[in-house]
């Protein structure tokens, strides 16, 4: 008798971009973060979740490359990580998300 592992995710997609967006939205809800943006080093938006301007927040994070900086009334947090020899930036408004569990989820999706 074999036991199948229990699937923890209730929302998933075989499409990479949609899966990244779902992952960001889940992180936003679980971590109580206003907005998340995932960008390239050049600040090009890959995906985002939340009410604020994803492209602008992501571009600021990729440019500043700083753990915390102010943008208007918001504190933004940028965290860089590598996937397939490409550096990406996860920028958040509200609280930092830079732990290995959160980043590992994004890396698994993007490595495919």
Language model features with spans:
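Non-catalytic interaction/Regulatory regions outside core domains
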Residues: 1-112
